[in-house]
Amino acid sequence: MTEMEASFRSYRNDATNVTKLSNHDEDRTLSRLGGDISKAKIAAAILLTISGSPYIYYGEEIGMLGMKASGDENVREPFLWSSIQSDKYRTKWINPLFSTESSVKPLDLQRNDKNSIFRVYEKFLKLRNTYQSLALGDMTYPANLDSYDKNFMIFFREYAGEKLMIIHNVSSNTSTIAISDPIVRAVADMGSVTYSKINTQSHSVTMPPYSTIIFEL
């Protein structure tokens, strides 16, 4: 976490950083993550809550696969809009090796699946459009950052009096964290996060593997 903080602070503050998980010249995110959809979801949640202007390479939002070593065309395979029998928009210029009917659920099916990676992108993009602090705000860190378990990625986004606290559990373990910041309410979560008040000044937050919670302060 401290490495990330140092990296962000090294960037110019008079320009907007462009953030991404992958592009057309790299292996697709889900392939780099060994096909682990939970890791791809937390990566998306992080991308859409950190500062900067996020760039989403087409197909990331439905978990498309692709490895550049097999050729550039295989990280640029056709987008799966719907089941192939009814997909009039799917291009035919290549027979895909990675993003096929058996490996990637088409968009029309993911729209109706509350646990799909598409719904993660949809949720966090809506949050960015709802909370100006996520889209435009400064990104800062708790003063006691080093005291937190390294399983957690914790930061604040703040803009025009609006302040959010974002906590990501980036590990494969369920972990609990105590926070003393004055919580107004939970804005959103990913992964069935639970929290309870310990006393008037602190809360206990239990986070499943690769989960996220956003608090309004």
Regions inferred by a protein language model and the residue ranges of each:
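A residue-level signal for conserved active-site and pocket-lining positions in enzyme catalytic cores
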Residues: H24, F124, Y210
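Beta-strand-rich binding/interaction modules
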Residues: T174-Y195
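C-terminal beta-strand-rich structural cap/linker in extracellular carbohydrate-active enzymes
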Residues: I198-L217
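Metal-dependent DNA phosphodiester-chemistry modules and their immediately adjacent helices/loops
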Residues: R9
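Loop/helix patches that line or flank the sugar-binding groove of alpha-linked glycan CAZymes
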Residues: T2-E3, R12-D14, R28, G34-T176
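Aromatic- and acid-rich polysaccharide-binding/catalytic face
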Residues: N17-D27
